[in-house]
Amino acid sequence: MASKKIRTRFAPSPTGYMHVGNLRTALYAYLIAKHEAGDFILRIEDTDQERLVDGAVDIIYNTLKLTGLNHDEGPDVGGEVGPYVQSERKAIYLEYAKNLVEKGEAYYCFCSKDRLDMLKENAEALKRPFKYDKHCLHLTKEEIEANLAKGLPYVIRQNNPTTGSTTFDDVIYGKITVDNSELEDMILIKSDGLPTYNFANVVDDHLMGITHVVRGNEYLSSSPKYNRLYEAFGWDVPIYVHCPPIMKDTHHKLSKRNGDASFEDLIQKGYLKEAVLNYIALLGWNPGTNEEIFSLEELTEKFDFKDISKSPAIFDDAKLKWMNGEYIRKLSLDEFHELAVPEYKKVLKKDFDLKFISDLLHTRCELLSDLADQIDFLEELPEYSTDLYVHKKMKSTVESSLENLEKVLPIIEEIDETNWNKDYIHEKVFELIKSLEIKNGQMLWPIRTALSGKSFTPGGAFELAILLGKEESISRLKKGIELLK
């Protein structure tokens, strides 16, 4: 018998930016499907109307397109099991909820907000978690019909047992058993007629033929309630893949509410989308080798969801920055230059050889947004301290720097504009170094410092001189001498 085609879904709520955790869920769902030549479906979960944010659906589409996580079915591309927007499926959920009522697996609840608030206050006073007391389960058929005829607002609740236990399997966390006494009678249909996230998920996953459900491990505790719904309907339970949380540090989860970076933030900071996707793949999954750099195609080939870890993953900014640098170095010079020019133009207004700057920075750059700070001195020499001239390794001191700059200045002034190139400047300066019998760094470090006013520069003394030109280089050397006196 042929195995069932794998179908996974990414089902985000359009409530704002694409968080790193959401993108990882999308990536893992995509990889599970595509590893087995299956289908990846996009479903928009907009049942919580109060939290919807204008433009958030476009962010979802744009992020998936940008990262190459192309969906086979969804609101924008269609498919055979649509509609793919939950608010457009309202009638479907109500029909299934009423079916559960008929089976005794759900019931109408007419409790007022005041009564529910009182129950919550009582639970708080007793320091117990709030749990609905099944008050409306005991209404007679006549009482229910009378309430409906009056038009009283209602919700439909799941009818969970209070004794025994429910067991389910998760491919990451194994067999999990929960006492039924801990299960609340969760709301399936809200008073506005829309389903809750939990109920819509189960109905849609079944109707859309989803075989593997990928989500965060915060949903582990809800899984027994989902399973009871599947069993009540007589449906197959999908394979659960609950992913470990992504942590900011050992104590705090990564959270947009705490100002942690979204995917859009990372792109705006100068991270390459390929690097971000690669890094996110490794937040909870290990290929079993020391390899760390993977294209989306390579991830699709190697990914096995059984290798996802139970342990929380720490979002390490330094590691992401390193990985981004690896991806930048894989770019051709022309590709890097195209990405870098907008960053250069943020700080450079004068005419510079931008391609030469890219040639210097390409192998050193880890983050595109760092580029402006690395070259801003070209436009205008910053104020700097003479402490910069002190460099132990270069054997450079304030005194030696003044002495050597005063000796090199006339050499630089004598170079004709027609000979203003790296090789010629190098030749003349090294002739001086040799005649003075000093270490190379004792001359080159002060020249570089005087030309840049910075401890880090895209190139050495000669590259900076070429970029700045003869006139500006002489002007800056003179300023350095004045500062050191």
UniProtKB/Swiss-Prot annotation:
EC number, as in UniProt: 6.1.1.17
Extent of the signal sequence: none
InterPro entries (alphabetical): aa-tRNA-synth_I_cd-bd (IPR045462), aa-tRNA-synth_I_codon-bd_sub2 (IPR020751), aa-tRNA-synth_I_CS (IPR001412), aa_tRNA-synth_I_cd-bd_sf (IPR008925), Glu-tRNA-ligase_bac/mito (IPR004527), Glu/Gln-tRNA-synth (IPR000924), Glu/Gln-tRNA-synth_Ib_cat-dom (IPR020058), GluQ/Sye (IPR049940)
Catalysis: reaction(s): tRNA(Glu) + L-glutamate + ATP = L-glutamyl-tRNA(Glu) + AMP + diphosphate
One MF annotation (Gene Ontology) recorded for this entry: tRNA binding
Any one Gene Ontology BP term: glutamyl-tRNA aminoacylation
Role noted for this protein: Catalyzes the attachment of glutamate to tRNA(Glu) in a two-step reaction: glutamate is first activated by ATP to form Glu-AMP and then transferred to the acceptor end of tRNA(Glu).
Name the record gives this protein: Glutamate--tRNA ligase
Source species taxonomy: Bacteria, Bacillati, Bacillota, Clostridia, Eubacteriales
Gene that encodes it: gltX
